[in-house]
């Protein structure tokens, strides 16, 4: 399957993305990860004000196949969570790079974005799977 990953996104090895938006970063999971999970039935996210640490679990996503931890692609403070994904997990499945975003974060160190893969490199990585 061919995936179209937005150019401004940066990706972690564990398939979470970070999308810079001014001084903030929107976090979600990639369309590839969503495709691998299958039908998503539940999403667990941290509360507003939670401090995330890069590479450390911040929540989980449950599908009919598995329960997977989600790791923070960047550290920072959670300013907003996507309530609609909590109420309707299929939004994550239908539009993971758009309406299915998970968190809006104020990064503690924006240079952590440089440690993530570009959309081009990530695309090459997942297309070989």
Curated annotation (Swiss-Prot):
SUPFAM superfamilies to which the protein is assigned, alphabetical: Single hybrid motif
Keyword set includes Transport: no
Domain Lipoyl-binding residue range list: 24-106
Needed co-factor(s): (R)-lipoate
Keywords carried by this UniProt record: Lipoyl
Entries under InterPro entries matching the protein: 2-oxoA_DH_lipoyl-BS, Biotin_lipoyl, GCV_H, GCV_H/Fam206, GCV_H_sub, Single_hybrid_motif
Family membership noted in the UniProt record: Belongs to the GcvH family.
Name by which UniProt lists this protein: Glycine cleavage system H protein
Originating organism: Prochlorococcus marinus (strain SARG / CCMP1375 / SS120)
């Amino acid at each position: 399957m061919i995936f179209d990953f937005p150019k401004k996104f940066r990706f972690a090895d564990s398939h979470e993305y970070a999308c810079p938006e001014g001084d903030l970063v929107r976090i979600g999971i990639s369309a590839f990860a969503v495709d691998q999970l299958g039908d998503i039935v539940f999403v667990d996210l941290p509360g507003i004000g939670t401090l995330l640490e890069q590479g450390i679990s911040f929540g989980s996503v449950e599908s009919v196949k598995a329960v997977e931890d989600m790791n923070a692609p960047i550290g920072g403070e959670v300013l907003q969570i996507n309530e609609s994904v909590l109420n309707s997990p299929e939004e994550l499945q239908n539009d993971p790079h758009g309406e299915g975003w998970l968190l809006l974060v104020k990064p503690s160190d924006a240079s952590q974005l440089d440690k993530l893969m570009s959309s081009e490199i990530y695309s090459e990585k997942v297309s070989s799977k």
